[in-house]
């Protein structure tokens, strides 16, 4: 048998996905994540109108690049990365003023649950009083955090992303994510404690402030 006889037949190229198939796959996999993505957009823009615009632009970009997304990898993290980059590039500089939005759009009780533990991991009487706060107060405290802390807390404590995926979404080292999350949770806890004190749920100095010593 000659070398010519031993030549293997060429493997036929894989059939390219049609536009109809791409659309069906996008609707099946990406569209169900719209509500969660809107929550992230609202946390970034702090304005419902901007959040809707940001989400729409994100989904247009996601659809345009959906052929490059590898099935079996984390679609949610992929979409959040597009959302975050779109916000940074397009909306951060022209952001509208924050406005009120319905309190039932996003539930943030996970934030208080993660923020209400002391450095020893034990719940104190003060932080247990935070459970009396309504979700609107928790939302307001989260919005008061610096952006980099706010988004780290949101991705970890609301969306449940692990550090590695948050680092990919925010395009920062894992160590930076851990630092932002630690500082963000601590600031959130202090803010919530201050609100609880104003509401009469906590007595004494604010968390993080020294007790007054009398002679």
Curated annotation (Swiss-Prot):
Q: Name one Pfam family in it.
A: Sigma70_r4_2
List the Gene Ontology MF annotations in alphabetical order: DNA binding; sigma factor activity
- Report the induction information: Expressed at low levels at 37 degrees Celsius; 5-fold further induced after heat shock (50 degress Celsius). A longer form is transiently induced by diamide (at protein level). Autoregulated. Part of the sigH-rshA operon.
Q: Does the keyword Membrane apply?
A: no
The family database entries (InterPro entries) matched by this protein are listed as: RNA_pol_sigma-70-like (IPR039425), RNA_pol_sigma-70_dom (IPR014284), RNA_pol_sigma70_actinobac (IPR014293), RNA_pol_sigma70_ECF_CS (IPR000838), RNA_pol_sigma70_r2 (IPR007627), RNA_pol_sigma70_r4_t2 (IPR013249), RNA_pol_sigma_r2 (IPR013325), RNA_pol_sigma_r3/r4-like (IPR013324)
* Keywords attached to this entry: DNA-binding, Sigma factor, Stress response, Transcription, Transcription regulation
If researchers knock out this gene, what phenotype do they report? Increased sensitivity to cumene hydroperoxide but not H(2)O(2). Increased sensitivity to the oxidant diamide.
Annotated region of DNA binding: 163-182
Q: Where is this motif: Polymerase core binding?
A: 53-56
What segment(s) does the record annotate as region Sigma-70 factor domain-4? Answer: 137-188
- Which family is it part of? Belongs to the sigma-70 factor family. ECF subfamily.
How does the record comment on the protein's domains?
A: The sigma-70 factor domain-2 mediates sequence-specific interaction with the -10 element in promoter DNA, and plays an important role in melting the double-stranded DNA and the formation of the transcription bubble. The sigma-70 factor domain-2 mediates interaction with the RNA polymerase subunits RpoB and RpoC.
Quaternary structure note: Interacts transiently with the RNA polymerase catalytic core formed by RpoA, RpoB, RpoC and RpoZ (2 alpha, 1 beta, 1 beta' and 1 omega subunit) to form the RNA polymerase holoenzyme that can initiate transcription. Interacts (via sigma-70 factor domain-4) with anti-sigma-H factor RshA, probably under reducing conditions, which prevents its interaction with RNA polymerase.
Q: What is this protein called?
A: ECF RNA polymerase sigma factor SigH
């Amino acid at each position: 048998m000659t070398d010519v006889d031993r030549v293997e037949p060429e493997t036929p190229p894989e059939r390219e996905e049609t536009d109809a198939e791409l659309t069906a796959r996008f609707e099946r996999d990406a569209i169900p994540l719209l509500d969660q993505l809107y929550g992230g957009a609202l946390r970034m823009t702090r304005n419902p109108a901007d959040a809707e615009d940001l989400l729409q632009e994100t989904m247009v970009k996601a659809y345009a690049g959906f052929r490059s997304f590898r099935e079996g990898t984390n679609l949610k993290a992929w979409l959040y990365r597009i959302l975050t980059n779109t916000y940074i590039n397009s909306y951060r500089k022209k952001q509208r003023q924050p406005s009120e939005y319905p309190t039932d759009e996003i539930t943030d009780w996970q934030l208080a649950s993660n923020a209400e533990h002391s450095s020893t991991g034990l719940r104190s009487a003060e932080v247990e009083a935070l459970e009396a706060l309504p979700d609107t107060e928790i939302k307001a405290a989260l919005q008061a955090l610096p952006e980099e802390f706010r988004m780290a807390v949101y991705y970890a404590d609301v969306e449940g992303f692990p550090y590695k995926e948050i680092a990919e979404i925010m395009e920062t080292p894992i160590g930076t994510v851990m630092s932002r999350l630690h500082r963000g949770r601590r600031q959130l806890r202090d803010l919530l404690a201050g609100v609880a004190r104003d509401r009469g749920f906590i007595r004494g100095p604010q968390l993080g402030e020294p007790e007054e010593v009398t002679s």
